[in-house]
Amino acid sequence: MTFKSGFVAILGRPNVGKSTFLNHVMGQXIAIMXDKAXTTRNKIMGIYTTDKEQIVFIDTPGIHKPKTALGDFMVESAYSTLREVDTVLFMVPADEARGKGDDMIIERLKAAKVPVILVVNKIDKVHPDQLLSQIDDFRNQMDFKEIVPISALQGNNVSRLVDILSENLDEGFQYFPSDQITDHPERFLVSEMVREKVLHLTREEIPHSVAVVVDSMKRDEETDKVHIRATIMVERDSQKGIIIGKGGAMLKKIGSMARRDIELMLGDKVFLETWVKVKKNWRDKKLDLADFGYNEREY
C-alpha cells in the first residue's frame, strides 16, 4: 500500500478558529482555545496519522499588525510556515466581512506559490445567503485550489476538508511515529494549559501580558504523582493581584482547573504548584521572550 504524507499550515487572522479546527481533527486539545484574539503564540504541530497517510498540521499565531516584540515574533512565526509546507489552509470567518488583515495575508499567499485552500469557518453563525456572498468575495481575490465551508466548533464538514487534503497528498515518508500527536514537549503543553486557564478565568481583566514557565516537572516516587512547579509571569503588580485573587482564591481555581486537564493529558496524578511573578515589559524584551519559550529557532 502506498503511504502519503504532507505538511499543512493553518493561517488566518486572530480568533478565526484555527486552534478549534486542529483540536477537532486531532480529537483532543493540542492548541489552547480562548475567545480572545492572539491566544496562540507559537507554531504548534498536530500530527494526524492513519494507516494510509500522515498529515502534519501546523497551527500558527493569528496574523495581526504587531505592536510589541512578542507580536513581531508571532507574525513572523506564522509567515515562516509558508517556506515549510505543501498546502496552506487560509481560514476566514463566515460572520465577518473581508478586512485589511485578510488582504495582507492574501498578498503574502500569492507570493508564496503554495496551493491554498480557503476554509470559511463558523458557518453555523450565518444564513446560507451570507455564506455564499462571503465565498464570492474571497473567490475574486485570488485563485484558491478549493473552497471549503466548515464549522470547526460543531464539526460540520471538517472530515470532508481532511478528505480533500488526503486526496492531494503526495507519496511520502511517515515523518513521526503513529502514536505521536504533536512536536511540542510535555512541558510546553503543561504551560499552555495553565495559561489557558488564566485567560479563561480572568477574562478581560488580564490582557495578553501573561506567560507561563514550567520550572520543574518530575515524578515523586513516594506519592506516585508528577510534581510540577510553574510560574505565571505578568507585567504589572495589579495583574499579579488579579491572578492571585482575594485570599489566593483565583490562583487556587486556576491551579485546580489546569491540574485536571494536565492529568488527562499525562494519564497521571499531578501535584501542581503555581506562583505569580512580575516582569515589567517582558513582551518587548527579546531575552525575556526566549526565556519564556518564544524562541524563533524552536517554534
Swiss-Prot record:
Residue numbers binding GTP: 12-19, 59-63, 121-124
Lineage: Bacteria, Bacillati, Bacillota, Bacilli, Lactobacillales
Ranges for region G4: 121-124
A Gene Ontology BP annotation from the UniProt entry: ribosomal small subunit assembly
Task of the protein: An essential GTPase that binds both GDP and GTP, with rapid nucleotide exchange. Plays a role in 16S rRNA processing and 30S ribosomal subunit biogenesis and possibly also in cell cycle regulation and energy metabolism.
Domain KH type-2: 202-280
Protein name (database record): GTPase Era
Cross-referenced InterPro entries: G_ERA_dom, GTP-bd, GTPase_Era-like, KH_dom-like_a/b, KH_dom_type_2, KH_sf_prok-type, P-loop_NTPase, Small_GTP-bd
Superkingdom of the source species: Bacteria
GO molecular function: GTP binding; GTPase activity; ribosomal small subunit binding; small ribosomal subunit rRNA binding
Coiled-coil spans in chain: none
Signal peptide positions on this chain: none
HAMAP family per record: GTPase_Era
Record bears the keyword Cytoplasm: yes
UniProt-annotated stretches for the region G1: 12-19
Any one GO cellular component localisation term in the record: plasma membrane
Family statement: Belongs to the TRAFAC class TrmE-Era-EngA-EngB-Septin-like GTPase superfamily. Era GTPase family.
Recorded topology in the membrane: Peripheral membrane protein
The keyword Coiled coil is assigned to this record: no
Keywords: Cell membrane, Cytoplasm, GTP-binding, Membrane, Nucleotide-binding, Ribosome biogenesis, RNA-binding, rRNA-binding
G3, as annotated region: 59-62
Subcellular location: Cytoplasm; Cell membrane
Residue ranges annotated for the Era-type G domain, each copy included: 4-171
Organism this protein belongs to: Streptococcus pneumoniae serotype 19F (strain G54)
Positions of the UniProt region annotated as G2: 38-42
This protein's encoding gene: era
